[in-house]
Amino acid sequence: TAFSIANDIIRNAHNEAHGAYNGIALIKLMGRDSGFIAANAVLAIQEVNFVLIPEISFDLYGPGGFLAALKKRLEERHHAVVVVAEGAGQDLFESLTGEKDASGNIKHQDIGIFLKEKIKAEFKALGFPFSLKYIDPSYIIRSAPANANDSKFCNLLAQNAVHAAMAGKTDFVIGFWNNQFTLMPIAAVVAKRKKIDVEGELWWNVLEATGQPISMKNS
């Protein structure tokens, strides 16, 4: 459901970017530590040119950096759509406070506003014409009612949880592996955060969809 809603937002953003000379649409999506929403939304619409996720660091400046790649895209096609997960690019900030929210998560700096200002400053300094629109849908993408597929899946999770509890099982969550519902120990589930495998099929599919460089680092 979340990336279906994000898909509609990206589609509208693409229309906005395409309607202006050297138009840039910059969309920030949820994803504190993993870029799954951004990656899946991009694959669903196939209109995004750059995806920035927490799993992969990038440089802003220099011939191999993001701004140079964005400028090249605009010179060739005169519009660009950029999707950034909220946890991407945190290493670009000069100071990190380490402050935590009520849930104990480290508060990230706002990469969306940061990129918006850096893009504007760089292209203005170069005298390069552009039009930039920044979109932050925030919680909109996860506050929508679940679609039919997600509703069905959640009902099946609940049914399996009740069956397991009635059988005397405890300290578990319901998983889904190889088209089978499974019982996973809570300790195993929370031991490690799930992240995109940047050498795996999902990320390579994203690279093929966007056409962005494999790396946006200068070295």
Residue ranges and their predicted role:
Residues 99-219:
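C-terminal non-catalytic interaction/assembly regions of soluble proteins
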Residues 1-24, 28-130:
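Accessory alpha-helical/coil subdomains and C-terminal extensions
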